[in-house]
Each structure stands twice: as structure tokens, then as C-alpha cells.
Amino acid sequence: MSILNGPRLNFWGGIRTDVSLPNNSPTIPYDGNDDWPLFDLTTSTLAPGAEPYTDDQLNNMINAPTGNYYTAGGWNHYGQHVVDMQNALISSQGEPGSITTTGDLVGQAVYLLGSVDPVTGQGPVSGPMMVDLDPTASTTTQIFVGGLQIGGNDNIQLLIRSNTVCSSFDVAGRVLLPKKMDAPGSFHASGTFQLTFPLSSIVSWNQNSSGLRSIIQAPGATGIVLRFVMFEMCPTMTTEQLDADYAAGKYTPNPSIGRVIGTLAPAFADEPLNCQPGRQLVNQSTGNAGYADLDNTGYLSIDMVNVIPKETFRAVRDDITSPIGPNADYGTVTISAGSTTLTTLEPTSRYLFDYYVYGGIVDLPLTADQLQAVRTSALAITAPGKVAGTTLQATESTYRIYADQRNVYLEDYPNGLSITLQVRYLGGAVPSATEIGLQAAAPAVYDQPQYWDFLDFPDSLTVGSGELSVSFPVTLKPGSAAQAGFVALTCTANGLDSSAYFTNFRKYAQTDFGIPQGTTITWPLMYPNVLRFHYLAFPAMSRYIPLNQPDAIMGAKNPILARTSDAYKGTTLFMPVVRSMSPCQRALLRAYLTGEPWQPPQ
């Protein structure tokens, strides 16, 4: 199942995410006010109080040092949102019970790719793009991807071209110490991503590779799945370095850098595309999770990458390619099902000490009695020791809900959508009728109902005994066209928080910007309503086309019209890559560029 219980390629290395930060908050500290309103992030425009200031004044305010933590706008103002792996190399391959560090693909590099231009067929000219659906949230993000490559350009082993998107799961504790460092608090956390590429998206592959044959030609396989975890992430530059860089007028991007551990395996038709299937075990101290599944040959495979945290952040800030090292040592680790011990692992075991070499996956051969215990009892991973005030007790969420929809832009579903929830009890069908509760939750920042109360959905659902899934409709409430904002819809089984799954939604406003239909759109009508926010929040865009200069915008008319069109949606080339421009904003920009009379989209 997915990366568990079958052939796999494991890799590890470094990763960079070059995101821009000012759009993570609608406010900045300014003039004695810690929460001076700068943006309206629901509409991607400026806050009314910021409008009278010039662009230069606002940029200076965003880049102003705060004294002890980067700038008013955060730790990176000039990011291009590109994600790229650094020296991520295959370290082991094989099947459960025979994973080896000497396979034919060991040492080959793994790359995520950007999109080929969907119109010209050229490229890719950039990489994958990290995008927040809700920029104010800290629970999930997305990476838009255009493909995958194994091997360098002069020795390509596998080339995939496929536009897809993955979302982060299990954004929870992964590094215990230090308690604080010169970085956002997320340096403690990890994020798990899963991508699925259909077999039809394979452009070329080395058919002499036994490692690739085992995956691509696996019986019943429909695609290739990639699961990767990034953790130990922090900005490249410290506060002192970034402030000095800005003071010198360099405005250098300051990407977040860290570690990546990943696995490639065959994908099958009955599996989720972008989240891990299987039985979920949650570390009760850190909140992070692992996943387990039985195969048909008596093996229990457990993805333990995030089950045991790392004790201490790496010693050298910018060293992201040296050996990751072992996780925290809690003593002998016991894996059990109910009262039945399945195995014990010593801290010196390769599964613990060199876990990252093996994708963090443990494969356990089981006896008949152990198999029966696994099928009927909750799994647990425990150890006797304490590290940094934490204990190791990872217990199974007996009920688990998951789905393919994690981040949804409602503009893509004008007539609403149906969400299918997968519901499991100890990895199988529910043994009795199970109630699923649905609850919409306000985001932390935009918590007034006008910003999140716009969805119609049932309050509860029932999954019948012996069933595995249930579907429900999500539509927009009547009269909600003018609303803009974000909402998380959380589903729980039998009221158990441990079973919960959430989907984030973003809604753009339907508006004419107060501009009469038929008006010829001029720069003063377009710029404050569309491009000004993007010029200030994402200045890296202006290194290609200065967004605040009318002549430059008109000079780039054709590429802008192309890149804002529906043909580029779902690619890493869509403009803007951060997907913060509403359909009405794109229409206003197009009207300005073409000279066509203003006609707001309906």
C-alpha cells in the first residue's frame, strides 16, 4: 500500500523553500503599533489606512528591522516561492525484508520539477512552487509540481511530466531542542507531502533498472507515489545577517533550508493521491504521526519518520546535506499490538540510528499470533526513557478519516463539489454505524463570520457497518458572492478528536470594484485593485516585470495575458504563482491590458 508493503526507493538530502513572508499577516509593527493594518489578505488589497502611503514608504516599513527578530515583514521579503532539493540522493532500495544500500539506483539524485509551458511546450524554466491557500494559517501549505526526475540531465533514469499539487500533513513537532533559536517557531516542526504521478505521465525510464522495474511494473500499479518529509527548517540568514543585507540595499532572498527524507513506490487505484493511507499512530508528546499497514505476506510496514523526534537541531545552520544523524534516544523501542509485543528495537538498530537511509520505514515479519493481534488491536510504539521532558508513547487512532481534498479553491468548483471521506477502524471497515461530525472553523486571524461563514454542508453523516467511505456535497451559501475569506472544515468520527481530518477552502469575492460596466480601465483604476498588493507582498515578481510601472506592464502584455489565463492554471507558471489574485482581479487586469470595456465575470 503506497510507500508501505512493496518495492521502494528511499532518499535523503537537503531542501530549500523560498517563500515570501509579508502576506502571512495582515499587520506589521509600525510607529508604536504592533498590529498596524497593512493588507486585507482576503481580497489581496491594501488596508485602507495603508493606501495613502507611497510604495517606497510601505516597502521601507516592511523591511524595517524589529530589533530582535528579522524585519517587520518577516524573515524573507524577496522569495520566489521555488522549492528545490539539494543533493537528495537515493540511499536504499528493495522490498520489505530485503532493503539494500547497494541497489542499482543508490546514489542517483532525485529532483522535483517545474511545469513545461502548457502552450509552447518549452521549459521547465522554474521549479515547484510553495503556495499557501490561507497565508495566515500555520497548519498546511501546498507545493505545485510539474514532474519528477531521477538522475542528472546527462544520465536520466526516470523522467515524469505531470502537473499536480501536494499539501502538507502532520505539521507537528519534530525537533525538541533548542527551545528557541533565531528562526520562526516552525523550526521545531515537520511537514509531510505526498504526490502521485500516473504511469501515463512517464516520459522516459531506464528499463534496465531493476529498482524502477519493480515499481513501474508492479502488478496492478497505476502510478508512482512520492512521500517526502521536510524538517529541521530555518531561514538561511540570521536576523543580523538579513538586516545587514537589507541595509546594504542587496535585498537577497532568504529561503528556508532544511532536511528531506523521501520514498518512491508504486501507486494503486484504491489509494489516496496526496495523503498517506494506513493506520495512524500519533506521538502523544509531539503530536506527530506515523502510518502502518499489513501486506499479504505477513509483513507490517510502519512509516516512522516522524514518530520519534530529533533531539537537537543541526549544529551548522547552513549544512543541510551532511548525515542527518539519529533521532532522540528514548532507550529500547517496543512496537506492540494491544498486549502483544511485535518487536523491540535497540537505539543502535539501523531502523533507529540510520533511519533516514531507509526512508524511516520499518518492516516487521509477523508470526500468526502477531498477525491476529495486529488485525484486532491498536498499535503502539513506546520506550522507557525521557528526552527534553518528553516521553515516547505513540498510540494508534483507532478511527481515522482522510481524503484527497486538503486545499480547495472554490473558484474551481462554481457548482460546488463532492468530498469523499475514507473512514477506517484499525485500518479496515467500521464495525458498526459510525457518525461523522462536520464543523466549519474560523481562521485565527479573519475570525468574523463574513470571512469564513459561506459554505453549505451537512452537519453529520453516517457510515454504515462494514463500509469504508462516505461522500457529501459542499456548496456556497446563497447570497455569499461578495464574501472573501478562508475556512477549515473538520470531520471527526464518533466525536473522537484523534480521528479528525480537515479541508481548507478559499473563497474569492465577486465584485466590480465599484467600476461601472463598460468603463475603459486605466492604470489608476487597475493598480490599487490588483497589482499594488502583489508589488508590495511579492517584490521578487518585479525582478521580471516591475509591477508598479505602467509601461513595463503594458510591455509585457502578452506574457501576462497568457500566464493569467486558465490554460496555465494548475501549473507552476500560473500568474501569480501564489494564487492570491481573484478571478475578478484577473479580469480587471486583462481589461486594462486589452483595452476592452470592463465586464466583471459572473
Regions from the PLM with identified roles:
Residues 1-602:
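Aromatic- and Gly/Pro-enriched helix-to-coil junctions and flexible linker segments
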